[in-house]
Amino acid sequence: WQGHAMEVGPLARVLMLYAKGHDLTQHLVNSTLQQLDLPVRALFSTLGRTAARTLETAVLADGMQGWLDSLVGNIKAGDTRTFNEAQCKPSSWPREAKGVGFMEAPRGGLARYVVIKDQKIDNYQAVVPSTWNAGPRDVQNQPGAYEAALQDNHELEDETKPVEILRT
């Protein structure tokens, strides 16, 4: 992002929602930190990343009913753009095509690319979250997200067993 390696995944998504002022996310993050009596910097740890998975799940679960209501309302009103039955029939498929899909997987951004020739997959590629997070230094010699995370001063429970770094 703008020339810098960025971590992807639940913590990144929760922090983005928090920074954007998403009310439920701010409430959940603040109350979690308060209940655990932890400072904000605790988010950038194994505990913080685990908590982010849980908090993100709560935010998504809370939104699902509204999304379902909108979908059903649109279908009842005749808006069926989310489903095109004709495109589900193999006879309607082109002999050659290219496709790309992006989504947020539990560990972070996921991209899939496909090339179809003679109605068969000619090439398929997935760029998985670990590709983003574990990427090497870039052309400007900036560290990838994992390396950058290890450069900070981590407080270790036992300096002879730095498992926090491995888990985070």
Where do the PLM segments sit?
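Metal/cofactor-centered catalytic core regions of large enzymes
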Residues: 1-168
